């Protein structure tokens, strides 16, 4: 009775506030994917017996695949031989899907299956435990749904002995976590992307303990926790995990698998086949949200088969009947409406043409074409070309090009001179002394009298005015018998070099090189051995390169065309951006959070992920961290809340004493009444009927039998 009286006094002094309490979880789920393996498809499984082998994998995890990477792919290194990596190249399929590989020898085919490992709280230590010395989680699953594959036993009973388990999670470091493991075969654990447990190879059960306080982690910061386990050999399979790490899954794929890639519920061959041999069918990206009313098949991706370019004269496209890239000759455009005639295709330049509107075809051609007709030089064009003298008449001769004749032609009377003044013809009568000197003229001459030294008028014939056409690029000729005047184009300029009607020299004429291809320069240049001989270069044009954010290509019809540079990302967390001077650079991907209690981070394997913020409590063994979102007046915050009921490790010793009682918080007078009047049975009845499960308290210290022989008055109910 004295003990009960003391308890009454102590309980009356306790002020217990239950509104800020929470219940400690009794289970911890580690969610991942297990990959069923079969030795015929991967001879790294069921090789000859091996031993524990460290340094098989690199110290840093592959952050893109979130899987380990072998230190070497050479099969005959000491570590690979000891670790029984018979075919190291197949290690990539230990923890990554290869479901559609052919079912042939060493193809690496595997079968992914979602897997959850449930750890149970040990309230006396505050750790979560999974202990299974008979660990065969996928018997009759994966490949083994087919009896053909059930041919491995432990001597008597069938089991699926060949599988690899991958668990990718995160946790918020609280400051005192531990992780213990015992099992076989390969086991690798990465924390903060660094290897902390290295138990590779085929071996008997082996263990390793990790105290996270030795890893240099920062309290209240999120870290990655990645666990990899393989069973590669008969006849045992054991595993024991004990940890206080509160691991959680920050991302689920559309199959509902933690850190999944969609492979457990989407098979591109089954779910995404569109029947088109010229598309590459793939499952939706792992972070795809499947809207209500839609199926996975509705969101599959179908990328066109890309066929490599051969040359400018060949189209290499996918044949819809065979699914193979098939080269065919390109069909060049009909450009007759542009007065262009097709030439043989050039592999480096593509379709080439010759213009029928060059001066070689007709010296009166301007080089322009309208509706399939070459445009010729007009009289005004020739006038401008030859000097535009108002006292001359200009026109274009199909044999000679631009020519001119006097506006005011001389008549038969040599004493009547037809004079032109600013385009106006007038007849001027000459004195017979200067115009009648007995000239005997041929058909190409005109009368001209000059005064001899003796003062007499003598004949000095001149060429007819119309013989000179004013074009220095023609050779003018008159037949003295018939008077026929001709103007022949000079032959000193050859090729694309044409005579300049102003200077009479040979000048390059680019129009003569027009090939109908906007990707060639169509430039006339002088030959190395003869400056009067022009040669067309027709070199491929160089498109601008000044703006590094534009990529130029040449279209044979349009010329240089540009499109924005698409800068590639580096992984999922480095975004490619373009600077017009520097070109492509990388910047970190920004993941925006919409609330204080939602964390948005970039995960290299996935991209932006959003998950609930985990708060680190002041005392992780006895408290839970609770996140409180911001309000209009208060910022978001984390707070620590006591577990209710208190875990046993947060209570005092089992024997009742004043010090013990003073440190134990009991939930109100109801508990006290139950304890006093009903003893242990009354307390148990109260505990079993509470709204919040008393899951984490296996014992009441007030009701523990004394280990030193002393009597605990509350251990038994009054008789």
UniProtKB/Swiss-Prot annotation:
Membrane spanning stretches: 659-679
UniProt membrane topology term: Single-pass type I membrane protein
Residues in the signal sequence: 1-19
Compartments it resides in: Membrane
Keyword terms of this UniProt record: Glycoprotein, Membrane, Signal, Transmembrane, Transmembrane helix
Domain (PA14): residue spans on this chain: 119-261
Glycosylation sites (chain numbering): 62, 105, 118, 151, 315, 379, 454, 488, 500, 538, 592, 629
Extracellular-facing ranges: 20-658
Predominant location: membrane
Any single GO CC term annotated in Swiss-Prot or TrEMBL for this entry: membrane
Pfam families documented for this protein: PA14 (PF07691)
Side of membrane Cytoplasmic, spans: 680-719
Family: Belongs to the prespore-cell-inducing factor family.
Protein name: Protein psiI
